Design a protein with these regions (language model features):
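Short helix-loop capping/hinge motifs at secondary-structure junctions, enriched
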Residues: 126-132, 151, 164-172, 250-258
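Extracellular/periplasmic juxtamembrane helices and adjacent flexible linkers that interface
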Residues: 251-333
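Ligand-binding pocket segment of bilobal, Venus flytrap-like solute-binding proteins
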Residues: 169-235
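N-terminal segment of the mature folded domain
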Residues: 24-152, 330
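Positively charged n-region of N-terminal signal peptides that target proteins for export
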Residues: 1-6
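A bilobed periplasmic-binding-protein/Venus flytrap-type ligand-binding module shared by bacterial periplasmic
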Residues: 119-127, 241-258, 275-279
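Short beta-strand->loop
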Residues: 30-32, 123-125, 143-170, 184-188, ...
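Bacterial N-terminal signal peptides
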Residues: 8-18
Length: 333
């Protein structure tokens, strides 16, 4: 009987050690909606890099969705080793829960944003509605597809880009911008929860005349549906800076801090920057950016800091409960 008990104890210990080892070698990246293709290729490259560096194998798990929803999932217990989200406010929200150091943005270069993007338009082939700039989105008879700013990071970039366009026009101010964005959302027939869902609504389901899209998502749609859609680059747009960080409490518990740190640092490596550029994210590395310069349209860009005073201020004013978006978006009206 003693041998049976000892054998059972040993077996339980082996199972526990096996589970711990598996946890240490499997990294969960919780990301925003349209990064699937980017991280599929990047992860494969990092697996080779890590094997060469450490002699150890590593596997990845993925979770993709609207950036705000993803942040909430991590706060509620999704065991992300790293988060690669659409905007800094969503990581700040996780930090407020105690899972991430509040000074997270200082840990990596460029405010922990290894690549940038912007917002462009995707229109039907031949641009039958003649959409050229933000002002065309409020015309009668133009249906605009954009995700829900309450759940999607990309949608918040869309909203803020439209707001600042209106504010910078002749005679523009916050009141005029509010009128403009309110008119724009009256032309939105449906709000998907994330950017990929909005792309599916526009490209696959054929709803709408114009999609407000991440630049990389627009180019991916062109690659897959070049006979159905075209890209229109507006006169002005926002510099979107998707940030990344390690989830401190999770990596401490799982023992994955070294791997998670190396994973995010590798995004800044020449190979990581090349992969980002190949997937139409604007690289930070100047040499890689110069190599891929012809991939990206020249567009006047403004930052959220200069236009809105940063994400905390923008979130409080526009996207918090009873904020400007809640005031202007009236479905069915």
């Amino acid at each position: 009987m003693k041998y049976v008990i000892k054998a059972a104890a040993v077996f339980a210990l082996i199972l526990a050690l096996t589970a711990a080892t598996a946890a240490q070698s499997a990294l969960l990246n919780v990301s925003y909606d349209p990064t699937r293709e980017l991280y599929e290729e990047f992860n494969a490259a990092f697996v080779k890099f890590w094997k060469t560096k450490s002699g150890k194998d590593i596997t990845f798990r993925h979770s993709h969705g609207g950036s705000g929803s993803q942040a909430r999932a991590v706060i509620d217990g999704l065991d992300a080793d790293v988060v690669t989200l659409a905007l800094a406010y969503d990581i700040d929200a996780i930090a407020q829960s105690g899972l991430i150091d509040k000074a997270w943005q200082k840990r990596l270069p460029q405010n922990s944003s290894p690549y940038t993007s912007t917002i462009v338009f995707l229109v039907r082939k031949g641009n039958p509605k003649g959409i050229k700039d933000w002002g065309d989105l409020v015309r009668q008879g133009v249906q605009v597809i954009t995700p829900n700013p309450k759940t999607s990071g990309g949608a918040r970039w869309n909203y803020l880009a439209a707001w600042e366009y209106a504010k910078r026009r002749a005679g523009g101010n916050d009141a005029k911008a509010r009128e403009f964005v309110s008119a724009l959302f009256k032309n939105v027939p449906v709000l998907d929860s994330g950017a990929r869902g909005a792309t599916t609504t526009f490209v696959q389901r054929g709803i709408g005349d114009v999609l407000l899209a991440w630049e990389n998502e627009a180019y991916l749609a062109i690659a897959e549906q070049k006979d159905k859609v075209d890209i229109v680059v507006p006169s002005i747009s926002i510099l979107a800076e998707p940030p990344v960080t390690v989830v401190d409490k999770v990596v401490a518990k799982k023992g994955t801090k070294a791997i998670a740190d190396a994973y995010l640092q590798y995004l800044y490596s020449p190979e990581g920057q090349e992969i980002a550029a190949k997937h139409y994210y604007r690289p930070r590395d100047q040499k890689v950016a110069a190599k891929y310069a012809n991939r990206f349209a020249k567009v006047q860009l403004f930052t959220i800091d200069e236009a809105f005073g940063g994400w905390q201020a923008a979130q409080k004013t526009h996207f918090a409960d009873k904020g400007t978006f809640d005031q202007i978006y009236k479905p069915g009206q």
